[in-house]
Amino acid sequence: MVKLQRFSEKKSLIHEFGKFILEKQESALTGDADAVFNIAISGGSMNQALYESLVNDKNIFPHIKWPQWRIFFCDERLVPFEDPQSNYGQFKKTVLDPLVHQGNQLNLGPTVYTINESLIGGGETANRKIAEEYASMLPASFDLILLGCGEDGHTCSLFPGVEFNYLVEEMDRKVLWCNNSPKAPKDRITFTLAVVAEAKSVCFLVRGAAKKAIMHDVLIVKNSELPSVLVNEMVGTKVTWFLDDEAGALIPENC
């Protein structure tokens, strides 16, 4: 059964989210200076949440062992890094760059694994190579994967609908080229559920009233046509959901 944490105050949600990540870091590193913390993150609003919970929280920030972090992206849009739609580009702008102003030099910061930008725009063969190369970089398993959930129930770039079965049903390959995203840009790469299933811990962060209907479908109805529900079914007790009261408005208090 998945774990559900709900918060009425944004400040409390963000702080507890940061504490959760910190706990997973400590579990992975166990005081070993040579150990690494393998974490994968989603794009979108996750970047701002990571800034608020890890960089801007003065109680959390001093305990983050950035040089031991190995950061990957659960999905990435096949656009240049300076494009506003680039997950890495937005992560750099929102999280990495502010680390300089916190006294951390970037060469002492986390190691971030990006797609091969030089292959972007090279067509089908190049797009498949981008996915294959990124898959080759991944660790055997992640200590933590941070996910979002779209209003349609998608997570990573795994979307509901039969036209996306080639992505959702893949359990052999770790990373695939998504060539028909319903949201621009249509070309992306995405983790498959095979990667998520092997993670030591998975966490969804969902905020806002726009998500209340899909949260009901995911957590109460448990519609197995939704990729986010498939994560719950596959990973079970390793999944934690962080919701604000707006997103959880249709979830019973005792759930």
UniProtKB/Swiss-Prot annotation:
| One Pfam family cited in the UniProt record for this chain | Glucosamine_iso
Alphabetically, the GO molecular function entries are: 6-phosphogluconolactonase activity
User: Its Gene Ontology biological processes?
Assistant: carbohydrate metabolic process; pentose-phosphate shunt, oxidative branch
Does the record carry Cytoplasm as a key word?
Answer: yes
- Cited InterPro entries: 6-phosphogluconolactonase_DevB, Glc/Gal-6P_isomerase, NagB/RpiA_transferase-like, PGLS
This protein's GO cellular component annotations are: cytoplasm; cytosol; nucleus
Report TM segments: none
Q: Which UniProt keywords apply?
A: Cytoplasm, Hydrolase
Enzyme group, top EC level? hydrolase
Query: What Enzyme Commission number(s) does the record list for this chain?
Result: 3.1.1.31
What's the catalysed reaction?
A: 6-phospho-D-glucono-1,5-lactone + H2O = 6-phospho-D-gluconate + H(+)
Please state the pathway this protein functions in, per its UniProt record.
Carbohydrate degradation; pentose phosphate pathway; D-ribulose 5-phosphate from D-glucose 6-phosphate (oxidative stage): step 2/3
Q: Does the keyword Cytoplasm apply?
A: yes
What the entry lists under Gene3D superfamilies is as follows: 3.40.50.1360
Q: Where in the cell is it found?
A: Cytoplasm
Question: Would you identify the family this protein belongs to, as annotated?
Answer: Belongs to the glucosamine/galactosamine-6-phosphate isomerase family. 6-phosphogluconolactonase subfamily.
Q: Any miscellaneous information on file?
A: Present with 4320 molecules/cell in log phase SD medium.
Functionally, this protein is described as follows:
Involved in the pentose phosphate pathway via hydrolysis of 6-phosphogluconolactone to 6-phosphogluconate.
Name of the featured protein: 6-phosphogluconolactonase 4
The source organism is Saccharomyces cerevisiae (strain ATCC 204508 / S288c) (Baker's yeast)
Q: Report the gene name.
A: SOL4
